[in-house]
Amino acid sequence: MGILELCDPDVAALRVEGSVADAIRLMLDRHVGAVGVVDSEGRVAGIFTERDVLRKLALTRRDPEATPVRELMTTPVELATTSTTPGEALAIMLERHFRHLPVVDNSSKLLGMLSIRNLLEQRIGDLNQELDSLEQYVTNDGPGG
């Protein structure tokens, strides 16, 4: 399975000119923990996450309506491409303690947002299938069994 297939096809993103309040509303409306922040051509400029809300907004008493998202977004941002494997993405996310990883094309245009949850669900599904196959093999009463 390709990395893009693990992403929500309707990625949550807003332009760098948007406000922090816009980003928070988008996360709440879409039930996601991160939004991609893109420039006028759709290229990833940063990522804004729940952690950014807690670490950069909540304790500073800044007005979310008046604060541009570009001031609080995480940048530079680690990116995955369509050629990144799920295993490589998982390794990056675990090593860097990321819960979200933007997936981009060769022009850095945002295609999807990969979440650690999506990766782990896929991995657990693969392991369950492997376990079922092994169980069937062991319990199969064939020749020599």
Region spans (language model):
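Tandem CBS (Bateman) regulatory domains
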Residues: 1-10, 49-94, 116-145
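Short, flexible active-site loop motifs that bind/organize anionic cofactors or intermediates
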Residues: 10-13, 43-44, 79, 109
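A glycine-centered beta-loop-beta connector
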Residues: 27-30, 35-51, 93, 101-119
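The conserved cystathionine-beta-synthase
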Residues: 13-31, 38, 79-97, 104
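Short, charge-rich amphipathic segments
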Residues: 18-29, 62-72, 107-108
